[in-house]
């Protein structure tokens, strides 16, 4: 089993636990050059809000989309969008990635923006 398969296996376990409690989830995806975040409804069928380092408004502000500063900006932007929709509590789905670096920066910025998880 390689590292990608291990990450996907961890992600499946997390998603199953979140689905069992029927919580709105904040799902992230990380690539070498960008970071993406979505708030997904409890039934898993609707993306309620999204933000990424590849968005037009953030792309102009960021020198590089693959940094912790970019991840923090994405977390802050997503928290603002969630507050606008009246979403305050979510379950954090880190998609099997370690809670370190860019993933941690996004999570902390979202918490500072008012999301609880």
UniProtKB/Swiss-Prot annotation:
Keyword Ribonucleoprotein: yes
GO biological processes: translation
Species this protein is from: Thiobacillus denitrificans (strain ATCC 25259 / T1)
Protein name stated in the entry: Large ribosomal subunit protein uL18
Highest taxon of source: Bacteria
GO cellular component term, pick one: cytosolic large ribosomal subunit
Task performed by this protein: This is one of the proteins that bind and probably mediate the attachment of the 5S RNA into the large ribosomal subunit, where it forms part of the central protuberance.
Family listed: Belongs to the universal ribosomal protein uL18 family.
Family matches, as CDD domains: Ribosomal_L18_L5e (cd00432)
Record keyword Ribonucleoprotein present: yes
Assembly and binders: Part of the 50S ribosomal subunit; part of the 5S rRNA/L5/L18/L25 subcomplex. Contacts the 5S and 23S rRNAs.
NCBIfam families noted in UniProt: L18_bact
Gene3D superfamilies for the chain: 3.30.420.100
GO molecular function: 5S rRNA binding; structural constituent of ribosome
Keywords linked to the UniProt accession: Ribonucleoprotein, Ribosomal protein, RNA-binding, rRNA-binding
InterPro entries reported in the protein's UniProt record: Ribosomal_uL18_bac-type, Ribosomal_uL18_bac/euk
